[in-house]
């Protein structure tokens, strides 16, 4: 059975690169009727926080990527890691190293002075016929993995193709710190082994970790998963996305009024494609997805295209759901939709005009309360006899028996003819008086929804 995993470190927010990794891992499992596992890699005790764990879990819930197993926490598995470390020590695949911090710094300085690549010189590595230094007093050793001294580590990456790295490029990795706590690269190996992960789909910043992890798996006689390393997501300037310059957190996008399905849809298109299809559901994505179709090249985040896609998802969204999503925004603006037109009817009229939920809430508010118009709009559209003219139009509105967009529309042409004005000289003042803005859908439809009594009240002040 196919088993994939998403394994974030809780040292900050859930960023969009992580969401795309989770999405591709989730989709591959769903496509193949497999299992998707969530693992929290929290061995960095100084940087991992409960707040970050919550942000990850909340983010996964918001985007709707459901997991079949987990969340598993590495900090709950320390006994298992110690057991496997001892197994490697007993089998001769790991050893204790008593180098002090000062020795390692001196070693690095000497190597850099010679122009060599800084690396541990394996002085504590046991070999046949080699005499090890005397164990110093007061030094707690680390445990290092015995990396093969020759040969290559090779794997067929599901995204990048064949990758080969010489063991001569690798040093003897520390797998346990002086206090006995296991290190990241080691925990990952044990977790993937124990959790029977068949496909490791992750960012290409992990490519250099892969040969080290493969060597450890081989030393444990454990099966090797298929590795697939996803390319980086760049910003529009072609630079790595950063929290300072770019909206990269899931929370950022939620606050900006993005629909989760729109974010997933767009992230799916960053590095993967299905012909010319831009707008699709997650059900379609799962049906179409394959690792072979993932590009090994980095992708640029195009904000304009992303917002266009969010607009398409808003248009396609159920109005009842949209009402739920914008309810907190309306409440914060003291807009009460319980009194006034049916919110579903309002959303049906305005949702094609916006690109995000924040803008949608702004489009909705004037149906329930008049905005204070901008001074420039008042000066431009309500100067001279415009207000008196609107009063005369209100009288005609008041005489209507049927309050519909059609009956309201039928008043426009004869009124403009009687007043000797153009339609813009009626429509714009109406918008400013009734809605407090010049930007609305068709004014007859807006007036029909707001209701006769409220429209007359707003016009007549």
UniProtKB/Swiss-Prot annotation:
Q: Does the keyword Ligase apply?
A: yes
Q: Which InterPro entries match?
A: aa-tRNA-synth_I_cd-bd, aa-tRNA-synth_I_codon-bd_sub2, aa-tRNA-synth_I_CS, aa_tRNA-synth_I_cd-bd_sf, Glu-tRNA-ligase_bac/mito, Glu/Gln-tRNA-synth, Glu/Gln-tRNA-synth_Ib_cat-dom, GluQ/Sye
Tell me which EC number(s) this protein carries: 6.1.1.17
Provide GO CC annotations from the record. Answer: cytosol
Give the EC class as a word: ligase
Tell me which Gene Ontology terms the entry assigns under biological process. Answer: glutamyl-tRNA aminoacylation
Keyword annotations for this protein, in alphabetical order, are: Aminoacyl-tRNA synthetase, ATP-binding, Cytoplasm, Ligase, Nucleotide-binding, Protein biosynthesis
The UniProt annotation places ATP binding at: 243
Top-level lineage group: Bacteria
Question: By its UniProt entry, which CDD domains does this protein fall under?
Answer: GluRS_core
Membrane-spanning residues? none
Q: Which residues form a coiled coil?
A: none
- Give the location of motif 'HIGH' region in residue numbers: 8-18
UniProt KW Oxidoreductase keyword = no
Show the HAMAP family listed in the entry: Glu_tRNA_synth_type1
Give the family this protein belongs to, as stated in its UniProt record: Belongs to the class-I aminoacyl-tRNA synthetase family. Glutamate--tRNA ligase type 1 subfamily.
User: What is the purpose of this protein?
Assistant: Catalyzes the attachment of glutamate to tRNA(Glu) in a two-step reaction: glutamate is first activated by ATP to form Glu-AMP and then transferred to the acceptor end of tRNA(Glu).
Protein name (database record)? Glutamate--tRNA ligase
Organism of this sequence: Chromobacterium violaceum (strain ATCC 12472 / DSM 30191 / JCM 1249 / CCUG 213 / NBRC 12614 / NCIMB 9131 / NCTC 9757 / MK)
Per the record, the gene is gltX
């Amino acid at each position: 059975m196919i088993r994939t995993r998403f394994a974030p470190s809780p040292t900050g927010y859930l960023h969009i690169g992580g969401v795309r990794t989770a999405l591709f891992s989730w989709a591959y499992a769903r496509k193949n009727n497999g299992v998707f596992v969530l693992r929290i890699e929290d061995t960095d005790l100084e940087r991992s926080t409960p707040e970050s764990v919550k942000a990850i879990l909340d983010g996964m819930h918001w985007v709707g990527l459901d997991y079949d197993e987990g969340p598993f926490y590495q900090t709950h598995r320390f006994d298992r890691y110690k057991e496997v470390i001892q197994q490697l020590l007993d089998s001769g695949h790991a050893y204790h190293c008593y180098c002090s911090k000062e020795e390692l710094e001196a070693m690095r300085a000497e190597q850099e002075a010679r122009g060599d690549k800084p690396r541990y010189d394996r002085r504590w590595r046991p070999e046949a016929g080699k005499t090890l230094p005397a164990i110093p007093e007061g030094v707690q050793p680390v445990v290092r993995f015995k990396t093969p001294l020759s040969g290559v580590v090779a794997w067929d990456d599901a995204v990048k193709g064949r990758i080969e790295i010489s063991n001569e490029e690798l040093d003897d990795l520390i797998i346990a710190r002086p206090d006995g706590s296991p290190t990241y690269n080691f925990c990952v190996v044990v977790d993937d082994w124990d959790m029977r992960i068949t496909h490791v789909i992750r960012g290409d910043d992990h490519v250099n970790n892969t040969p080290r992890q493969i060597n450890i798996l081989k030393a444990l006689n454990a099966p090797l998963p298929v590795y697939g390393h996803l390319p980086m997501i760049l910003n529009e300037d072609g630079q790595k996305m950063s929290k300072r310059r770019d909206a990269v957190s899931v929370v950022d996008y939620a606050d900006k009024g993005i629909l989760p399905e729109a974010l997933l849809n767009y992230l799916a298109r960053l590095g993967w494609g299905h012909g010319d299809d831009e707008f699709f559901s997650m059900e379609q994505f799962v049906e179409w997805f394959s690792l072979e179709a993932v590009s090994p090249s980095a992708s640029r985040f195009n904000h304009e295209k992303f917002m266009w896609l969010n607009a398409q998802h808003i248009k396609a969204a159920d109005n009842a759901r949209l009402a739920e999503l914008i309810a907190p925004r309306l409440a914060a603006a003291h807009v009460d939709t319980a009194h006034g037109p049916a919110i579903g009817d309002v959303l049906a009229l305005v949702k094609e005009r916006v690109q995000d939920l924040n803008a949608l809430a702004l489009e909705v508010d004037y149906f329930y309360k008049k905005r204070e118009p901008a001074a420039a709009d008042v000066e431009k559209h309500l100067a001279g006899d415009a207000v008196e003219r609107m009063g005369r139009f209100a009288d005609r509105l008041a005489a209507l028996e049927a309050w519909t967009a059609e009956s309201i529309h039928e008043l426009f042409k004869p009124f403009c003819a009687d007043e000797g004005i153009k339609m813009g000289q009626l429509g714009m003042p109406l918008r400013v008086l009734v809605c407090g803005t010049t930007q609305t859908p068709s004014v007859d439809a807006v007036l029909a929804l707001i209701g006769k009594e409220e429209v007359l009240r707003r016009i007549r002040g």
